[in-house]
Amino acid sequence: MTFNHKKMEPKWQQYWSEHNTFKTTEDKDKENFYALDMFPYPSGAGLHVGHPEGYTATDILSRMKRMQGKNVLHPIGWDAFGLPAEQYAIDTGNDPEEFTALNIANFTRQIKSLGFSYDWDREINTTDPEYYKWTQWIFEKLYENGLAYEAEIAVNWCPALGTVLANEEVIDGKSERGGFPVFRKPMRQWMLKITAYADRLLDDLELVDWPENIKDMQRNWIGRSEGAEVTFKIKDSDETFNVFTTRPDTLFGATYTVFAPEHELIEKITTPEQKEAVEAYKKQVELKSELERTDLAKDKTGVFTGAYAINPINGEEVPIWIADYVLIQYGTGAIMAVPAHDERDFEFAQQFGLNIRPVLEGGDVTKEAFTGDGPHINSDFLNGLAKAEAITAAIDWLEKEGIGSRKITYRLRDWLFSRQRYWGEPIPVIHWEDGETTLVPEDELPLLLPKATEIKPSGTGESPLANLHDWVNVTDENGRKGRRETNTMPQWAGSSWYFLRYIDPKNSEAIADKEKLAEWLPVDVYIGGAEHAVLHLLYARFWHKFLYDIGVVPTKEPFQKLFNQGMILGENNEKMSKSRGNVVNPDEVVEKYGADTLRLYEMFMGPLEASIAWNENGLEGARKFLDRIWRLLVTEEGTLAEKVTTDANANLEKAYHHMVKTVTNHYENLRFNTGISQLMIFINEAYKRDTIPKQYVEGFVQLLSPIAPHLAEELWEILGHTETISYVAWPTYDETKLVEDEVEIVLQVNGKVKSKITVAKSLGKEELEKLAHEDDKIKENIDGKTIRKVIVVPGKLVNIVAN
């Protein structure tokens, strides 16, 4: 006997919708709980089975917390700007807005079919002007506070896509989407000064309950380094340049310097003999991505400029080279090379026959760089010193001589915030013919994205908005002509603050009401994929800290607890992808097995954080378990089984209280697979009994309800209830019922286990010894032997020594 999920699931989904069951309560007497999912990008492909894993986890918590008497905020929305919709529009001539709306409708249908308890009244969409009005408002505040500025930046320009790509969107010199060639090209860009927040972004990781590996990824991305900035003079010139080094104590070993190919001094200092070689090399580098340039495994390339610098610590002339492994956007765009003690510098020096001088004792620098520590040698006043002392002494000397100083640098770069795309938030800025740049007045926000009949790349590197002359060209009241900013914001913009808007999504006067923000922040639990570990989370933390500084939000950090679910892989343990043809569509699973089965299966696959292969047999097993529950509790006619009685049954008492305690604990700690195991154990016990107390059945159904809500609602109704199960008080357990009153005693002869007996826990030594002698197996083993000694450990064992 089985239940009909095709009838049952839509029935309860309709009930929840009609009764607005999951509308967020804001009862002042209750505690608040904010459970957040990383909102999806509504792609044309629709939901895949990886999405529901994280969504089910937050849904279990949300359903449990409602039953535990909390106000629960559990919202959903759409991160709907982005390149795929634009690419689709360029390829097909269709409107990205219409395409996006269709995708959202499909995602909504799919999500509702899975029974998630979202408050749909709070749905948001980053492409809604009433939403992006506030994204633009935040940009204006950043600009007013000196945190948004324009700069000429060498960017990843992809002619085929007609846009600039972020470093993360470039893989091996090609665009992540479509695999088109990418080139480096300087362009005017908007930047956000995230570096101003580097220390706080680092230090405040201590305030949050996040996985340590994610914190480490953020720490490495920010990349704080302490060291010194050193000034080098250029021989026969008034020019100087600075280098940053974490090891100023190795200056005596600096035998050459290297500039990034984009360094501004290269043109001035290159000698006529080297000009042609330098120009050719620079052209070659333009075709390479940052990742290719810094790949440790590749052969080193470079070219000599013909010029020399003066090493400030010993007055030596050292050649100035250019090489692609030095990046203009890191440090100063120039490095001092100490080949004896740095692997990359060593390989470069070997390749081009440059001088290698050891300044630390240890290793054999004729064979490889020595990167360990040792006393200083060949270093004048630093000789004999260990690392820490030598660094201090070197910096003191540099500062005294006025040619260097202590400095902290960061790997973190300012955030490249503009995109040469149509489908994004317009940047609310006007550039006037007299050189002034102004913001669109706040009372004129949102600056609407204009409709375009045809979206095509401008060809100049500007966004397709540059083609819309009526929109771009403006005149002020004095007849002054201006041009609107044609760059749009990156997809990261709308997702950097969306969790704030859920708190008060209809507010037209502010991002959200201050009092409500204070009640709900920080987010209690945020669940999503680890692929967003760095960028999204770093950007959201940056915006949140800025909003904290200007008094908009009351907390320093947005997300108190973060959890990353693992990836669901294809049956062959490979990542699911359209190209591999191994993507599983949740619609098909819901049709065949039901949403409750899918939810149960994904939570039972293994630990939430593990990446696990999809397995059809596992789905069958999950459905079988739900059918077992149904058969145990419901008759063929659909009424409550006779074995469910109002009589108390002490037999199941311990199993029940143990289940409530364990399941509650495991759900709280996101260990859903082991929580489900406990539900299975209870059902196995219940099958062995002639009767099951109704109150235990009700408690069981409540514990099941966050995982399999449709089946639980149906069983709750069969149990005689007329209201939804969603707000019934969560079951409690009694510790005293969990105390073991019986123990298993091991019976041994000469230290070898021969038998086991279950006895009352209170039994003393004499009774245990008597029972051991009466045991048939023991009698058999000591027959004809002399008993030398009997060892009794109450509650554990009886060991008879006999020969």
Swiss-Prot record:
Give residues annotated as binding ATP. 578
| A single GO cellular-component term on record | cytosol
Whether Ligase counts among this entry's keywords is yes
Superkingdom, natural source: Bacteria
InterPro entries in alphabetical order: aa-tRNA-synth_I_CS, aa-tRNA-synth_Ia, Leu-tRNA-ligase, Leu_tRNA-synth_edit, M/V/L/I-tRNA-synth_anticd-bd, Methionyl/Leucyl_tRNA_Synth, Rossmann-like_a/b/a_fold, tRNAsynth_Ia_anticodon-bd
A matching Pfam family: Anticodon_1
Name the residue ranges of motif: 'KMSKS' region. 575-579
Principal localisation = cytoplasm
Protein name per the record: Leucine--tRNA ligase
From which organism does this entry originate?
Listeria innocua serovar 6a (strain ATCC BAA-680 / CLIP 11262)
